[in-house]
């Protein structure tokens, strides 16, 4: 995946997280499904770069926070806002210049 494609995926993930802020249960599930699809693309791209394990751990962190927002992890008793902050933090980590060989 080219740098601009990765940037577009990361921007899309940010929009989905932001859209989940006021989303109802059904929309949160749709957003989660879209996040999972985009994260699958990122995982494929991560295989091309060093630090694959670290990148996939951050991708999993994002997926887990969005699953909690969608209500799939009822045992996670953090407020929804904290999961959204965690998801944004994971995206911020992925946008760092050290990920995916992006320029700083």
Regions found by a protein language model. Give the residues of each.
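Amphipathic alpha-helical binding modules
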Residues: 63-104
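Amphipathic alpha-helical interaction modules
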Residues: 18-68
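Short terminal alpha-helical segments
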Residues: 1-39, 88, 94, 98
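Intrinsic low-complexity, intrinsically disordered segments enriched in polar/basic residues
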Residues: 1-2, 58, 69, 104
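Short, structured helix-loop boundary elements
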Residues: 3, 56-59, 81-84
């Amino acid at each position: 995946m080219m740098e601009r494609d990765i940037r577009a995926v990361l921007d899309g993930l940010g929009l989905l997280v932001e859209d989940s802020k006021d989303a109802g249960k059904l929309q949160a599930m749709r957003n989660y499904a879209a996040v999972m699809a985009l994260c699958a693309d990122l995982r494929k791209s991560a295989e091309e770069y060093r630090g694959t394990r670290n990148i996939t751990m951050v991708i999993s962190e994002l997926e887990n926070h969005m699953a909690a927002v969608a209500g799939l992890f009822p045992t996670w008793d953090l407020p929804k806002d904290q999961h959204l902050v965690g998801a944004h933090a994971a995206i911020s980590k992925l946008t760092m210049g050290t990920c995916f060989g992006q320029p700083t």
